[in-house]
């Protein structure tokens, strides 16, 4: 992705959060220059990858395949004694016409909540023991206290306020229901590790390579400078 695309996506996500009164923590507003002076008191932000996260999944067409996210809180699976939180929270922004590709998580379970805007469609499949997609078996779905069964590949429609529970090894993808508008989502989960806990099918990247065509508006969660001693 070009840095200009990343900056544009960040501003759009920021505006969507403001529109739906989802106020962000202070570290989301630090400029790149301000990050240069942040000491070890912000190690949790660095080590747990809190903050902004823009991806095109390495496909080079963000408006068709992409997602904009903010990790607001998180623990660490590898540094549990230092960061003992067992939960994470994100905000996610999906534009109409965008698609977030099919994947599951080995470790975390999560609730995906429609926080406002249009309707999101989440397609679900079970997985086989070899981690391939099960295109045949029915899927047990949990939405807002309701448990029911749907055929493989069904898209679960979430209107604002509705949510779905995604268990481990459940393949799922995201798109916006056409004509309903961009969507702001929430995610509540176990600890999040996007470097090691995404099984995409077909395989693809999670974090984009960035072409620096302008200065960054905000740093992404993978870009923080080391703390000054």
Residue ranges of predicted features:
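Double-stranded beta-helix
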Residues: 129-148, 175-229
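A short, N-terminal "cap"/entry segment at the start of jelly-roll beta-barrel domains
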Residues: 1-87, 216-223
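Short helix/loop capping segments that flank catalytic or ligand/cofactor-binding pockets
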Residues: 102, 123, 174-175, 196
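Short, conserved secondary-structure segments in the cores of folded domains
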Residues: 90, 110-111, 154, 162
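A short beta-loop-beta micro-motif enriched in histidine and acidic residues
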Residues: 77-88, 99-111, 115-116
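Glycine- and acidic-residue-biased ligand/ion/polar-headgroup-sensing regions
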Residues: 95-96, 108-110, 114-130, 134-135, ...
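Conserved metal-binding segment of the jelly-roll/cupin
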Residues: 95, 152-179, 185-190
């Amino acid at each position: 992705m070009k840095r200009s695309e990343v900056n544009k996506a960040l501003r759009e996500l920021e505006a969507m959060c403001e529109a739906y009164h989802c106020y962000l923590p202070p570290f989301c507003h630090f400029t790149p220059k301000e990050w240069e002076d942040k000491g070890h008191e912000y190690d949790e932000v660095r080590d747990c990858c809190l903050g902004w996260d823009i991806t095109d999944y390495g496909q080079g067409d963000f408006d068709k395949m992409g997602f904009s996210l903010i990790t607001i809180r998180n623990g660490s699976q590898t540094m549990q004694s230092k960061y003992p939180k067992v939960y994470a929270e994100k905000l996610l922004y999906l534009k109409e016409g965008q698609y977030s590709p099919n994947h599951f998580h080995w470790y975390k379970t999560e609730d995906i909540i429609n926080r406002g805007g249009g309707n999101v469609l989440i397609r679900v499949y079970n997985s086989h023991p070899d981690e391939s997609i099960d295109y045949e078996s029915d899927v047990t779905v949990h939405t807002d206290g309701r448990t029911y069964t749907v055929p493989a590949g069904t898209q679960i429609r979430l209107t604002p306020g509705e949510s779905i529970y995604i268990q481990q090894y459940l393949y799922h993808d995201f798109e916006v229901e056409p004509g309903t508008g961009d969507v702001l989502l929430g995610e509540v989960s176990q600890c999040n590790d996007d470097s090691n806990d995404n099984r995409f099918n077909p395989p693809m990247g999670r974090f984009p390579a960035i072409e620096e065509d302008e200065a960054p508006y905000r740093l992404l969660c993978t870009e923080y400078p080391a703390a000054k001693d």
